[in-house]
């Protein structure tokens, strides 16, 4: 009995553990590859992203992931209220089920998301849908002890008596899961107390099995049936007694006592409330029953007395007795009567026992035969099952070993692939990190260079601005100087015109002087003629004196005019000399400033040239280092691509392309730097060449001016020589005239002095002009030196031009090379882009193939795992079932064997007792036979004695009194005459057989129960 009870308890514990495993996992076990974009957005609670996905594709409203979960399931499981309202507004399916046939309402209740559950209930969700385990939303609310959710579900017409596959209502489920608050809540909401599960266990039995005394008190307060039995025939009190739960036993006993007291009170109240008429009727009925029983007893006694009288008459006829022995016989008769009564009672009991034993023998024989057949079949089935189990165990072990080997192999492959994948990912990440670092370094270097270029350009701009300001100032000064030079040229031209006019005047005067000299010669010739002729001398003298006076006046006027002209010439020469000195000073300043500027500019250009050379060297070094780094990265990429089983030719092409790209990039950088530097230097060279051209132009103009001045000086020299010659000639003529004319000698002396003075003045002017010419020669020498320095500058400029041409040629070569490189770079870029596209396409294809293979492999693995798990589960279940059956059979067999041994011992004890009883019975039979013979003899005597007595019986006889006092039913007296044999050996054997059958039946009763 205890084994059965312990089996029931273990079954309850197993059900509780399975229930905990079933209900413990809340929410979903989510993997990212199982989800779509809308499912990820729903899990995150991103309602905007969900709405965006739905606007793009309205079909995604009820779309499922790879585990058959909708967006509403995931949103309810994670408590995303906004997403749930959005989906319900879009009219999604509210009662849609997942793979376990669970609705979104079940998931919201299971995950204790009350807000989502309330929204679903308000929108009309069905709370009575069952999952694959038969559980409703109320079961999940009970498991989570959600009283508020349970109230909401009950207010929306949830079934409080819904049964799951185990036959548990929410109340029974709450007791199984030890949820006392939910039990109280369900009892308040009028849950059925008398509900039964698949094992016919009530709520009280479950509470006793789980040792929940508080729930037992609640159920007893609700007047639950105590005597209800489960499928094993056990009550709650039996389970409490078996499990030694004394507190629960006391509670049940107290409840029983209360129930009995209440029942007695109710009976008393009923009897008190009954009318007296009913009591009278009951009394009459009782009296009638007693009268009938008394009449039957009297009739039976009369019949017995008549039979006994007949027997006594016969005995009296056979053996007459004396009246003296009447007292003894009377005592013997009373003793015999008592013995007969005992014997009759014993015989009736024996008869009933025999009938029962026969009936039971037949039943037991049939049952034993059936049991033997069942045992034989059971043994055969056990043997067959053992053989089948051994075979299946061997097969399953082989299959398990094969599956384990396959799993190990697949796991090793998976681990290898994962390891390779991780290694490749690590390599790719390292390459990406290296590339990122290289790119960052490259970007930093470019930023530095850009900053340097910006600073350099800013410096250039500032320099250009300063140069522009200086050049603007110089241009302004040049404009002023050019204006001044222009004005000086205009004045010089005016002076030239005046000089020409004076030259013309001098020529006219010289012509006039020549004419005067001719006139003087003619006059002298005439005077000579006159002297020769001496006619009219005085008149002619007066005429000659008048003519001389007029000629002297003319000469004076001419001298005055010459003086004025000479003064004007001197003034003009002074002004021209001053202007020339100013112009020369300005030119010297300009030339000196230009030379200084050119020297400074040349120094700056040389410094910049050296700086650019140093930068080019640095860039070449950096380029070499980058090329080394890029080649290392290329080698790593080549190794990486080789690992992905790419062909060698595109890899070599990509490496060559990368090398060409690097070279083109470096050449681009160099060209860019060289282009930036020569552009700036070109501007500087242009400015220098413009300055040089201006200097050359100014030098040419100065040379032209010097030539013109030299020509003018030579002209002046020629004019002076002409004037000196003319004056000498004129003086000679004057002297000759005065030599001839003694009268006018003084005047001629005066004139000669004046002419000498004029000649001295002219000589002084000549010396001044010669000094000026010397100064001009010195200036010319200075200008020649300057021209020589300018020649050197020109040589330097020519060198610079040559360098510039060389640089331009280099730039052109670089441009051509750059164009070629650009063309090659374009081709390389196209080829690279094609290769990149091909590589990307190949990588994408490989990734897609890898992902597809991985997905297929994962699907296959999942299917294999599912199949393996399913097969293993099936095999385990079959093994468990077989083991359970086998264990049950073993336990039953062991129990049967132990009980059989016990029953054998009891049977041996019973046989001993039976043998002792049979011996006692034989002894009692012998005694009875002796007594019966004595009684028979005494009956015959009494009959004979009574036959001699009158027929009416004496009421004072004790035998008659005893017969009247004994109430014997007719049915217990046998109709046939009872024969008492002296010896009956079959009775003991029959008793033995009946006892053995009883013992066997009592021993095999639990086996029948188990079967």
UniProtKB/Swiss-Prot annotation:
Residues 280-293 have a biased composition (Basic residues). Residues 277-319, 385-639, 692-722, 752-908 form a coiled coil. Disulfide bonds: none annotated. Residues 264-330, 533-554 are annotated as: Disordered. Keywords: ANK repeat, Coiled coil, Repeat. ANK repeats lie at residues 67-96, 100-129, 133-162, 166-195, 199-228. Residues 294-319 have a biased composition (Basic and acidic residues). InterPro entries: Ankyrin_repeat_domain (IPR050657), Ankyrin_rpt (IPR002110), Ankyrin_rpt-contain_sf (IPR036770), CC144C-like_CC_dom (IPR039497), DUF3496 (IPR021885). It holds the Pfam family DUF3496. This is Ankyrin repeat domain-containing protein 18B. It comes from Homo sapiens. The gene is ANKRD18B.
């Amino acid at each position: 009995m205890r084994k059965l009870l312990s089996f029931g308890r273990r079954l309850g514990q197993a059900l509780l553990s399975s229930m905990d495993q079933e209900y413990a996992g809340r929410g979903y076990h989510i993997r990212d590859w199982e989800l779509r974009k809308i499912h990820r957005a729903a899990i995150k609670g991103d309602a905007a992203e969900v709405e965006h996905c739905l606007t793009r594709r309205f079909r995604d409203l009820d779309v499922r992931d790879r585990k058959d979960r909708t967006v509403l399931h995931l949103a309810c499981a994670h408590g995303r209220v906004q997403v749930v309202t959005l989906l319900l507004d879009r009219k999604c399916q509210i009662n849609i089920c997942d793979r376990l046939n669970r609705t979104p309402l079940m998931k919201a209740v299971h995950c204790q998301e009350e807000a989502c559950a309330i929204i679903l209930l308000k929108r009309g969700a069905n709370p009575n849908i069952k999952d694959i385990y038969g559980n409703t939303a109320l079961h999940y609310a009970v498991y989570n002890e959600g009283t508020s959710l349970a109230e909401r579900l009950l207010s929306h017409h949830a079934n409080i008596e819904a049964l799951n596959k185990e036959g548990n209502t929410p109340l029974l489920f709450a007791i199984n899961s030890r949820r006392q608050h939910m039990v109280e809540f369900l009892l308040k909401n009028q849950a059925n107390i008398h509900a039964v599960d698949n094992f016919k266990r009530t709520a009280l039995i479950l509470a006793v099995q789980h040792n929940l005394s508080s729930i037992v008190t609640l159920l007893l307060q609700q007047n639950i049936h105590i005597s209800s039995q489960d499928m094993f025939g056990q009550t709650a009190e039996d389970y409490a007694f078996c499990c030694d739960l004394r507190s629960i036993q006391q509670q049940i006993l107290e409840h029983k006592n209360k129930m009995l007291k209440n029942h007695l009170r109710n009976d008393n109240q009923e009897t008190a409330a009954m009318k007296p008429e009913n009591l009278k009727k009951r009394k009459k009925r009782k009296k009638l029953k007693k009268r009938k029983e008394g009449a039957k007893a009297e009739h039976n006694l009369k019949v017995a007395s008549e039979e006994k009288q007949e027997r006594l008459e016969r005995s009296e006829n056979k053996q007459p007795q004396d009246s003296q022995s009447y007292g003894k016989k009377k005592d013997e008769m009373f003793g015999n009567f008592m013995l007969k009564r005992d014997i009759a009672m014993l015989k009736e009991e024996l008869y009933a026992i025999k009938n029962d034993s026969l009936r039971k023998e037949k039943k037991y024989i049939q049952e034993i035969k059936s049991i033997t057949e069942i045992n034989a079949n059971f043994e055969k089935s056990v043997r067959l099952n053992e053989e089948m189990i051994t075979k299946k165990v061997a097969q399953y072990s082989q299959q398990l070993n094969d599956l384990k080997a396959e799993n190990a192999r697949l796991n090793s492959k998976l681990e290898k692939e994962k390891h390779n994948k991780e290694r490749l990912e690590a390599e790719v990440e390292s390459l990406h990190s290296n590339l990122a670092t290289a790119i960052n370094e490259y970007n930093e270097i470019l930023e530095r260079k850009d900053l340097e270029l910006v600073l350099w350009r800013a410096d250039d701009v500032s320099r250009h601005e300063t140069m522009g300001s200086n050049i603007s100032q110089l241009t302004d000064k040049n404009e002023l100087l050019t204006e001044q030079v222009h004005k000086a040229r205009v004045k010089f031209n005016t002076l030239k015109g005046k000089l020409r006019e004076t030259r013309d005047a001098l020529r006219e005067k010289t012509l006039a002087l020549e004419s005067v000299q001719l006139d003087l010669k003619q006059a002298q010739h005439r005077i000579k003629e006159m002297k020769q002729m001496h006619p009219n001398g005085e008149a002619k003298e007066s005429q000659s004196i008048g003519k001389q006076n007029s000629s002297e006046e003319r000469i004076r006027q001419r001298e005055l005019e010459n003086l004025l002209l000479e003064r004007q010439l001197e003034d003009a020469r002074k002004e021209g000399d001053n202007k020339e000195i100013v112009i020369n000073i300005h030119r010297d300043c300009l030339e000196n400033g230009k030379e200084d500027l050119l020297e400074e500019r040349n120094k700056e250009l040389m410094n910049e040239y050296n700086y650019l050379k140093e930068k080019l060297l640095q860039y070449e070094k950096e380029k070499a280092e980058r090329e080394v780094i890029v080649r290392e990265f290329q080698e790593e990429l080549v190794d990486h691509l080789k690992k992905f089983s790419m062909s060698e030719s595109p890899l070599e092409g990509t490496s060559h392309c990368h090398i060409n790209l690097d070279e083109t990039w470096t050449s681009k950088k160099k060209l860019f730097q060289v282009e930036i530097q020569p552009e700036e230097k070109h501007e500087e060279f242009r400015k220098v060449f413009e300055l040089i051209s201006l200097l050359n132009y100014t030098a040419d103009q100065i040379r032209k001016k010097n030539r013109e001045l030299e020509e003018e000086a030579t002209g002046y020299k020629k004019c002076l020589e002409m004037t000196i010659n003319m004056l000498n000639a004129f003086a000679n003529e004057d002297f000759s005239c005065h030599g001839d004319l003694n009268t006018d000698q003084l005047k001629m002396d005066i004139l000669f002095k004046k002419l000498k003075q004029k000649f001295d003045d002219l000589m002084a002017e000549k010396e001044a002009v010669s000094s000026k010419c010397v100064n001009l020669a010195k200036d010319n020498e200075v200008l020649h030196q300057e021209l020589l320095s300018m020649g050197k500058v020109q040589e330097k400029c020519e060198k610079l031009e040559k360098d510039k041409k060389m640089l331009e040629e280099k730039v052109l070569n670089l441009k051509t090379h750059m164009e070629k490189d650009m063309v090659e770079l374009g081709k390389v870029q196209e080829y690279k882009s094609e290769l990149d596209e091909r590589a990307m396409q190949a990588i994408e294809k490989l990734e897609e193939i890898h992902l597809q293979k991985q997905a297929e492999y994962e699907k296959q693995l999942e299917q294999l795992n599912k199949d393996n798990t399913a097969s293993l589960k099936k095999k385990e279940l079959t093994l468990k079932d077989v083991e359970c059956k086998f264990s049950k059979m073993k336990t039953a067999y062991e129990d049967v064997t132990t009980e059989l041994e016990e029953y054998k011992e009891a049977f041996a004890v019973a046989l001993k007792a039976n043998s002792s009883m049979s011996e006692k019975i034989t002894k009692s039979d012998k005694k009875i036979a002796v007594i019966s013979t004595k009684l028979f003899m005494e009956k015959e005597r009494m009959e004979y004695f009574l036959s001699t007595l009158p027929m009416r019986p004496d009421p004072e006889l004790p035998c008659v009194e005893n017969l009247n006092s004994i109430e014997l039913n007719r049915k217990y007296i046998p109709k046939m005459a009872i024969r008492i044999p002296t010896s009956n050996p079959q009775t003991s054997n029959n008793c033995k057989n009946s006892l053995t059958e009883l013992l066997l039946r009592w021993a095999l009763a639990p086996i029948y129960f188990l079967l």
